[in-house]
Amino acid sequence: MINIIIKANMKKIILQGYDVGDFSNQQSIVPIYKGNNIEAYLAQKAPEAREIFIYAHGSQYFSHEHSLPQLSLTLQSSNNELVPSILSKITENTEENKPNIVHILSCHASTAHYNMQNINGNIVLCTYAPANYVSNGYVAELLFNTKNNFDNLNDFIVKKLPLLTAISFGISYKLDENVYPLIFDNSSIKGMDINSFSEFLQKQYIKVQKFYTNLQEKYVDKYPELFPEYNFPEKISYSTEELKQAFNVLLNLDSEKLSIEEIQHLLAIDNSHVGNILADAIKCNRTDAIEVVINTMKEATTVDLHSAVKFNNLAVLNRLLDKTEKVENCILQEAIQEHKIEIAEMLINSNKIKSFTNDYLLVAINANNLPILKILLNKEENIVGYLLYRAAELENINTAETVELLFDKTKETDYFINTRVLLRAVKENCLSLINKVIGRMNEFDDIPDVIFDSVIERGNTQIIKILLEKIASFDFLIKAINSNNLPAVEDILKTIKVENKDIAAIIMSGNTDMFKILANKIGDDKILDIAIKLGDSSVVNNILDEKEKQGILDSNKLDEIFETAVKNSNGNVIEDIMNRMPEVTGKHLTIAMQYYAPERAFIFDKVYNSIKQIEYNLILTAIDSGIPDVIQKLVSKLGDEKKASILYDILRSSDIVKNMVVSNILLNNIAKIPDNYKYALLDLTSKGNSYGIKNFFIFNRLLEKSGPIDEEHLNTYLGLLDPSDMFSIMCMGSLYNMKHLASNHNNITTVEDTIVDNLTVTGEINITPSDVNLL
């Protein structure tokens, strides 16, 4: 009995290089390290030995067999590391020099066995490809999954010896600076049959026994965890299926090195998986090998069809289509994406595609494959809107042609799809598609700004005319104006009915060329009116200069223009117009009063300051307007005599509000009431006018501006005061505190007491001497 076993239940991990596919069950078996994580893992300390799978692209540094191999573990191939340096990092970071088990699943992996002396530390290395072989994903995954069914390495080697022999499995132990390799050679089994291969395996089995026996005897004491007891059967046997699998793996491992006779021989033993050999044969254009493989297979798989599509081999694809009942979606999609038109057409016409879905169209659209799209559209009756939207989004050359094909096949399109398609059509000046989209749009649909921008940018007048029949002309005109596109502006103005907002937009652009185009269309009177409203002095003056040259600018026209300017509060324009007038008169000030508002006060001031003489009727007009600021300005130029006369007329009116407001303004501007108006005004306010209106507030203000009052009038006015009226009380204070009364009464307290007594007797109001002083 020989005892050889590798420690079971070691922690398994995988270092996965870039650009290699995942194994189907790797996530559930091992932690995975990729990219920068690999570098971090190789740098960290490990307390226990591990079982490590390195799955990466491998290459030999030199061409000869024993050269140093490389592994591509990172994204950049220039960062490839030599296998010995990677393995040394693993061993050096394992505590107590415990031996790790490392499996290299890559091309040329066996080369590593010839460089074991370059590795620092103890290690068990397993490889699964000869030094001169290129491995493949099928074989790598098969071996990975097979090994993971065994925790015991010896079990794996013994029970899977046919498979390992076929792939030239190699194992090396590096212990205490000594290297012990065992490497199988598959070259002799290519011509064997099942029986001879079975006999050959018995000899290989004896080599395995001897190899481990020697190691166990030498190292069992020092490394007992590597060499516990293991029971080797006296004789080993394998099932026919296991033996066939080995031949099939050999067939797929590197078929380029097999002769046609060897291929035929191996296929005769097992043809269950021929995907790799067929792919290699198509790639190398080995027609004899292709013929042999296809004749042998019962049914073509998706992998086989993929190989024919990948290498664009119509003849092989045609043969394979005869060997399958159904073509999977991915095959046709691949042909479309790769722009393999003949391949795609053959697949479409093969009747092996069960249903044509919009998925194929999407692939053709994304690939901008117009020929294939045309073929596919013949198979589809109705296209979903998303495909049309997607096509319109692409920025490829001649996308509009693709979009138009889809648009014709899409029965229903919404606003968003229509606008996106319209933008694409505009960008490529596709008039036919523009007409189709416009015809399908709702009359109330808005056109996004991006379409306006695109139309104006290209300046295609035909497109402009088409769109003007559908869309709001003003928005379109604004875009043309803002981009200074004269041809577009001219075309739009020819088509639309020009409105004030259009004129305003052109005026505000400041573009004189556009201005001339507009003037030719509507005449300058309309432009002048809008320019005045906008306050554009430059345009106004240009038009007025032209009218002066033509002799058609008279005073009536200027008055009309002046009133328009006043209405629109354009001070600069008003000033320019007044400068053209022979004289600014009351008529112009009346207009300014007519449209007066606090925010327009500056306009009134401009006109007011330009008038040389204020006529009396203007003042009356101002008073009638009831505008305090206007009245204030006009009466300020009058003398006190004239102001008193107007005040008398105002106080005689029946308008209480005007009576109060205008009287106050006048009194604010009168320094002293003329004597000839003093008693007339005081009588009018205290006794009442013909309408019975008294105004003790104004009466009190008149007292302030009237000077001394004789005793007769004083007594009369005191008798007229109403103690219940607040303003009457104010008047009492004014009367009793006038200077001329102080000189006629030696004891003012007696006078105050008299007032208080009189007021108290009335029973209507009580007032104290201190109240009188306060008043």
From Swiss-Prot:
The keyword Repeat applies. Keywords: ANK repeat, Repeat. The keyword Repeat applies. ANK repeats lie at residues 66-95, 300-329, 331-356, 357-385, 447-476, 523-552. InterPro entries: Ankyrin_rpt-contain_sf. This is Putative ankyrin repeat protein RBE_0801. It comes from Rickettsia bellii (strain RML369-C).
